[in-house]
Each structure stands twice: as C-alpha cells, then as structure tokens.
Amino acid sequence: MSNPLPRKLFVTTALPYANGAFHIGHIMEYIQADIWVRFQRMQGNQVDFVGADDAHGAPIMIAAEKAGLTPQQFVSNIAAGRKQYLDGFHIAFDNWSSTDSPENHQLAQQIYLDLKKAGLIASKTVEQFFDPEKNMFLPDRYIKGECPKCHTKDQYGDNCEVCAAVYSPTDLINPYSALTGATPVLKHSEHFFFTLSDPRCVAFLEEWVSGLDTDGKTHLQAEVANKVKEWFSARTNPDGTISEGLNDWDISRDAPYFGIEIPDAPGKYFYVWLDAPVGYLASLKNLLDKRGENFDAYMAEPALEQIHFIGKDIVNFHTLFWPAMLKFSGRKTPNKVFVHGFLTVNNGEKMSKSRGTGLDPLKYLSLGMNPEWLRYYLANKLSARNEDIDFNPEDFIARVNSDLIGKYVNIASRAAGFIAKKFDGRVVSDWATADDVFISKLRNVASEIQALYDQREYGKALRTIMEQADAINAYVDANKPWELAKKPENSAALQEVCSRLLEAFRILTIYLKPVLPELAKQVEALLNIAPLQWSDVGTPLPHNHQVNPYSHLMTRVEPKMLDALFDMPAVVDVTVNVPNGTSETEVAADSTIEAIAPEIKIDDFAKIDLRIAKIVNCEHVEGSDKLLRLTLDMGEGRLRNVFSGIKSAYQPEDLIGKLTVMVANLAPRKMKFGISEGMVLAASAADEKSNPGIYILNPWPGAEPGMRVG
C-alpha cells in the first residue's frame, strides 16, 4: 500500500524567534508537521525534517545587551531550552540549527548577490528616526509617543494599542526612544530593496500562486491563494484605504545590528526576514554536511519536494518574498506552503496570559499530562484549511477518554489478558483468509486514511479510524469473550476471537501511529513485533505467534488536571514582605506595617544561603497574571529557572541585565508552570490595597553574580 516510487521530501516549520520559550502555537505547528512527516516515513518515503532558531534582529541585540551577554550567548541560552519541549511532545526534527550559523551567512549572502546580478536589488535613500544617545536607527517598535488619532500616550511607532490605528513613526506626537527616552531625530540612510514590483517578479508570482505543482495540485490552499492574489494589484479596500499592489521590499538595516552583513556594503545588514527563511536551507545544509552529502546535488534532484508548514500570520513572507527570492537567485521554489490557523480556547477566545486562558506547554508536561493526549486532540481539530482551531477543556477530556481509552485501548485490554492467561500468549491466524469480512473491512479503509493523512485532513482520518474502532468494539460485544472464557469447550473460539481482536488492534495502531508514536512503540512491544509500517496492514500476526503479557497502555484524563492546567495561582509567590518603616518608632506606630516574625538564632539564619544573581532573561508565564519566569546566572556554570510573583510591577524587558538577591539553597519546587530553582527577594506591604507595589531587591554597584549576602 506504499507509493510505487518513494518520494523525497524536505520539510520545514516556521522558525521561532529566539527571544523566548516556545508557546503552544509553536507546539501545535510542530505537531502538525511531525504527524505528516511520520506518516510519510511509514509510506517508505525519504524525509528530511529541519528547524532552526530565528536568531537575528534588533530585539535580540537589545535584550542581550541588557542581560550583559553577547547576542550569540543570549540566543544560545534560549536554544538550550528547546529540547525539553520537542522531546516532551515527541516532535522529531532531524536537525535544529540557527540563522546565525555559518551556513546561513554564506547562503544568505550568495542569494543576495544572485538577486543583485539578476538586476533585482536597488538602493534608495530613506528617512528614519535615530536615537542620538544610543547612536542607532530605531525600529518602529522602539519608538513611542502620542497616538495621532486618539492621543493616547506611550504608543508604539507603528500602531496604537488603544484605538488600533496604523500609522508611520513620523506621525507620532512627541516621539521618544523606548531605549533611552531621548527625542529621536530624523536622519537619511541608504537602504537596499528587493524590487518585488519588477514585472518579472509579478509575472512569476502570479503564475506560481495560480499554477499547479508536479502532483497536479496548487502550491497553496485555495483560500490562501485567493488572499495572496489580492496583493498583486492596486485596489480600494472596503475601509476606503488604497492598496498599491506589490511594493519593493526594504531588505537592509543599519549598524549597530545583530545580523548578517550585506556584501560590499559596510555597516549594512540584512533585515531579519531576508535571512530567516534562508535558515531552512541552512539547517538542511548543516544536516547534509554532517551526513557527508552534497547540498547542491541534493537540491538539484528533480524529484525533491520542498514543503513549508507555517501560520497564517506570515503568509506574505512565504508566498511573495520567499518564492521570488528563490526563483531569481536560481534556486528551487517551494512545492507547497501549508498554512494553518491560530489556536483559541473555550469556543473562540484567543490565548491570553493575563486572563488565565493560556495553555503553557511546559506546565502541561510538568503536571504529568500525557503529551499524546494533546497530539491526538489537536490532530482531531486540524484540517487542510487555514482555519482557527479551538481547545475546549471539556471536549478534550471527553474526546481523549472516549476515543483513546474507551474505544482504542479497550480493545487490547479485553483481548490480551485472555491470550496471556489461557493460551500462553499465543495467537492463531488460521482464520485469516482473504474473504474474512471482519478484518477485510478494516484493511479496506487503509487507502482512504492514507489519502487523508497525505492531505493533512487529520480530523477526518481520525474520525474514520474511530468508526473502525466502533465496529471492532461491536464485534467484542457480539462475541462476548468473557462469556466464552467460562466454558472450557469454547477455548478454541475464545482464542480465535481474541486473536482477531489483537489483529484488529494491530491494524488500528498502524493507522494511529503518526499521531501516537510512543503509544505505538508500547503496542509493538506488547505484540512482540518490529516497528510497524503502512505496508504491514495486510500482513497479520503469524500463526502461533507469542505476544507479551498486557500492561497498562494509557490512563484517563482527569478533570482536575485541566483545572490545574488553566488555574492561576491565587497568591503572589516567591516574594518576601519587608517593613517599609525607617525607624523603630515609625514601625510601632503604623498599623499597616506587618509584625516582625518570631526571633531566631544566628544558626537558623546561617542556613539560608543568599546570593547575588544576574537576570539574563525574563518572560511572561503563559496562563498566569502574577508570575514572571526569570533565568538567573549565579556564577555557578549553569542557569537557574525561578518563578516570581512580580508581574504586576515589572515588564520582563526592564529586568533583563539587572542584579538581584536570591535564596540559592532552597529546594527546587515543582510548580504548575514548571520547576522553580530558588527564590528571588522582593519587598511588599502588608496592606496591599494602600500600597500594592512589589519591589525586587537590587544590590549596589560592585556586587557580582555568586557573591554571598549576609
């Protein structure tokens, strides 16, 4: 049932920006791609599945500076945290790289030179805001000021968060630098542009968007193609604004900038979105170099299919700039760009950290929740369209428990026990004839399920599989093996019924394996067989084959797990109440000051190891409106993860690079959001209503990470 000629596939997912941990949107996309890759491999197809960190840009450069790190060190620290997510959710990339890799530098510069040779690079003088104190041009998000529409203060340089107006940074009233507070000045600079408006680019893109791939199907989903076509020509939008068609694309940024230098242009760097998609090719080249294979020869193979999985928020980069860059630099263009929607929660509410509607991937794992529950649930929701999908806790519980436990695992639990206890683990297959209706019906849907997986119609595939599970359970109810087991004269019938059930369970496992790879491994061990391939659907367990004793395959989802997953801590964590009074008299006279704790001996205090720590990274905690996740360097050769209830008082970017005081020898604590490896000290008032502030302790200049406080 495999393809006559194996396919050769180069598969990627969108690159995550290397300024923070993975969120659930990343995990959803990786699961979608991983299922497709695993399915293709079960068909006997060759797949190279690669990813990378998007490592360049002003935000990373600035965050690294605040943390007292080089951008490379900052990105490396972020990258070190990727493995726990990927391994945790059984996402099996063949290679993970970085856009700051040597391969990406070389490829990005060569693509630029090829585009320049093709006459598609032009230079223009642009006017930008410049921070005279920082001595750098400011990206839009690092310029703030008063909104020109609603006059709300402290709005970003490209849009207002209050009235949603979109404008140019030069439209801001009283603009200032978000980095230094200085008033920016307008300066001219020469920038380089990829001339996407060139008739050659327009003609190619119109053909690529509407044209057919080698499989006779379009490169894009129909709804995506229709949207992209709207960008090709000037038009008046429903809101009265004018769209000008394809514009030339500014691909350069001025120093200082963390990125890839533009050849023969000192002080100029590629805009991050030019070298980011090149990172797909660079990660593949890095993988091929490790294997001793030639990258150019690999990419030149006519049968190679280049497949990109992305979210709908980055369609323009992947369906306009990226194909045109590849085409006119003389490279292979994408065969498919598969676009998915966003993940919402509770019937369409967007994921929100502040409202407690976020789904934090690490918290999910730290609660001991089975990653394959989530893989199965998301797969049930995913289709070939770029529609948003909804995570509903009640639906999650019902679907996992009903389908995976009640329908699928239940088959093995009913049959394997009898085979082990009464027949020494031996199955029979003399019943397995070509005209066996029960098993034949199960095998006959293989091609239908195969097509649905290939088309990324996972929800339809799983519904078809569960229809087969229903039929198998109906067979159980009709034949009642528990009744057959009561009479010795029914021994042969019992063995045949249970053998049929295990064969049916084996076939269902093949169908589910792309979604549930770890559960499939357990089933392969139970059935004492080699790793299952799609072509094994028609090959039953041999007659007298011995299976292993049944052991529990999967537990049920408990509602309390979902309560914990979306629960927000009710109290501020890891803060210390410190009196605000300045003298003993004032403390005694002020009833709002918290009473001093009972007296302790010096030996008690000596047990507490207080150390100076540097905050090298800080980020919001998905699902919590009180916690920040701090990454701390205490000078011990490793970084620590600490949760602190200071979100109401601080923005993460304001803490990066600061020194603080932490309890270094506090036992690690398993929290709902992960492991906290210490406690940072902060002050807060006993009466939070009159003084709601939280004040993190910050040592005087001269203190260094690792110094003891006492």
Swiss-Prot record:
Q: Which GO terms describe its molecular function?
A: ATP binding; metal ion binding; methionine-tRNA ligase activity; tRNA binding
**Keyword terms, alphabetized:** Aminoacyl-tRNA synthetase, ATP-binding, Cytoplasm, Ligase, Metal-binding, Nucleotide-binding, Protein biosynthesis, RNA-binding, tRNA-binding, Zinc
Q: Does the keyword Phosphoprotein apply?
A: no
Q: What does this protein do?
A: Is required not only for elongation of protein synthesis but also for the initiation of all mRNA translation through initiator tRNA(fMet) aminoacylation.
Identify the residue span(s) of motif 'KMSKS' region.
350-354
Q: Which SUPFAM superfamilies does this chain map to?
A: Anticodon-binding domain of a subclass of class I aminoacyl-tRNA synthetases, Methionyl-tRNA synthetase (MetRS), Zn-domain, Nucleic acid-binding proteins, Nucleotidylyl transferase
Query: Which Pfam families does the record associate with it?
Result: Anticodon_1, tRNA-synt_1g, tRNA_bind
Q: Which cofactor does it need?
A: Zn(2+)
Q: Bound how, and how many: what does the cofactor note say?
A: Binds 1 zinc ion per subunit.
Q: Which InterPro entries match?
A: aa-tRNA-synth_I_CS (IPR001412), Anticodon_Met (IPR041872), M/V/L/I-tRNA-synth_anticd-bd (IPR013155), Met-tRNA-synth_bsu_C (IPR004495), Met-tRNA_ligase_1 (IPR023458), Met-tRNA_synth (IPR014758), Methionyl/Leucyl_tRNA_Synth (IPR015413), MetRS_core (IPR033911)
Location comes to: Cytoplasm
A Gene Ontology biological process in which this protein takes part is:
methionyl-tRNA aminoacylation
- Organism, by scientific name, is Herminiimonas arsenicoxydans
Position of motif 'HIGH' region?
16-26
- Which parts of the sequence bind ATP? K353
What is the superkingdom listed in this entry's lineage?
Answer: Bacteria
**What's a single GO CC term here?**
cytosol
Record flagged with keyword Signal? no
CDD domains referenced in this protein's UniProt entry, alphabetically: Anticodon_Ia_Met, MetRS_core, tRNA_bind_EcMetRS_like
UniProt-recorded name of the protein = Methionine--tRNA ligase
> Could you tell me which residue ranges the tRNA-binding domain spans?
604-710
> What does the record note on quaternary structure?
Homodimer.
Q: Which PANTHER family match?
A: METHIONINE--TRNA LIGASE, METHIONINE--TRNA LIGASE, CYTOPLASMIC
Task: Tell me what reaction this enzyme catalyses.
Answer: tRNA(Met) + L-methionine + ATP = L-methionyl-tRNA(Met) + AMP + diphosphate
Q: What is its EC number?
A: 6.1.1.10
